[in-house]
Regions:
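Short aromatic-rich membrane-water interface segments that cap or initiate transmembrane helices
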Residues: 1-7, 58-69
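Functionally important transmembrane alpha-helices
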Residues: 65-138
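Small-polar-interrupted transmembrane alpha-helices in polytopic inner-membrane proteins
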Residues: 4, 12, 31-51, 96-104
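Specific transmembrane helices
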Residues: 1-7, 11-22, 119, 123-126, ...
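Short, highly charged, low-complexity non-transmembrane loops/tails of multi-pass membrane proteins
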Residues: 136-146
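Membrane-water interface at transmembrane helix exits
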Residues: 7, 11, 16, 20, ...
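Membrane-interface helix/loop boundary segments of multi-pass membrane proteins
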Residues: 10-39, 53-57, 85-90
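Membrane-interface helix caps and helix-loop-helix hairpins in membrane proteins
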Residues: 52-61, 108-114
Length: 146
């Protein structure tokens, strides 16, 4: 569960790092969140296309939960990418670790049994609240830098 999450989150991290991290437009903490969420949504579309060839129920569950999961976990990672870009934090590693843990728990809850799948809902709600808090912090950092 963790290996798949690690690979997927590193793909999204690598995409942002490779394509937008060094752009002059990436100059605020919030930019890290925005660019990483955008990368995650593109990833989620491609992943769901792969699942579209399987059972309809899997596609429906993934369509409702996987897209928010990717956006939320990557948004949290993006906050730390933004911090590292603006020199407020040495490394984006804490964000990568958090994203992998959230994603790993998501995978675990969904794949272990139908009974544990319900735990995806509180995981997404709690993670969403964390992301909202980080967005507010990012806006404060960005407001202080202008």
């Amino acid at each position: 569960f963790i290996i798949a999450a690690l690979v997927e989150e590193l793909i999204k991290f690598g995409t942002v790092r490779l394509y937008v991290f060094n752009k002059p437009e990436f100059d605020e903490v919030t930019d890290g969140i925005v660019y990483t969420v955008a990368a995650s949504l593109g990833f989620a579309v491609l992943e769901n296309l792969m699942y579209s060839f399987g059972p309809t129920t899997v596609l429906l569950i993934r369509g409702v939960t996987a897209v928010p999961l990717h956006a939320i976990a990557s948004g949290i990672m993006g906050y730390f990418i933004g911090l590292s870009k603006t020199r407020r934090c040495r490394s984006a590693a804490p964000g990568i670790i958090l994203a992998v843990l959230i994603h790993g728990f998501y995978n675990f809850f969904l794949f272990i049994s139908t009974y544990t799948a319900i735990l995806v809902i509180p995981l997404l709600v709690i993670s969403w609240r964390v992301l909202r808090s980080l967005i507010r912090k990012a806006q404060l950092f960005d407001g202080a830098s202008t």
